[in-house]
Amino acid sequence: TVTGAWQHEGGGAFHNNGAIYRWDKTLIEGLDVLDPTTRMLDMSRIGRVLTGERSELGDGPPVTALFIQNQNPVQVAPEQRLVKAGFARDDLFACVHEQFMTATARMADVVLPATMFLEHDDLYQGGGHQYIQLGPKLIEPPGECRSNHDVVSALARRVGARHAGFDM
């Protein structure tokens, strides 16, 4: 972003300094129920994943459904030609939970309205510092907007999953 490349397709950055914290996220991330056999796919290689490159699929079948929050891969992921081709597949179902009609949301089959940071309680790990901050809800969300936590918890319950973190 120093060069202003974020303004151009494929010029975004993936960044997280969360590893500096010793925060037990077992409850909020469901770490106690993770299945170690679940394949992990590299979001920075989403174009190759969605176009079915075998080396990127982790010995699993092609991806046929996506649920996307807090990302805009159609705009910022590398290898834009592959990303757009992957999202354009007829056999791919994409649900995007988003605040704005981003490039990724425009390619989704379903777009769910998301809250903004002032519309739900949250805790924040620092970006560029080492503090944890409380972000209290200050205003009501408009219309049918829901927080990431509310949507994920509701979806999990709908498919029969149970976890104490869903009730937070």
Where is each model-derived feature located?
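Generic secondary-structure signature for well-ordered alpha-helical cores
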Residues: 1-8, 116, 137, 157-164
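N-terminal leader/propeptide and maturation segments of large enzyme subunits in energy/redox metabolism
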Residues: 67, 138-168
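Catalytic, metal-anchored helix/loop core of enzyme active sites in primary metabolism
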Residues: 109
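Sequence-level detector for tyrosine residue identity
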Residues: 21, 124, 131, 149, ...
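Extended redox/cofactor-interaction regions of prokaryotic respiratory oxidoreductases
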Residues: 2-106, 115-123
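Glycine/threonine-rich phosphate-binding loop and adjacent beta-strand/alpha-helix elements that clamp
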Residues: 118-141, 152, 156
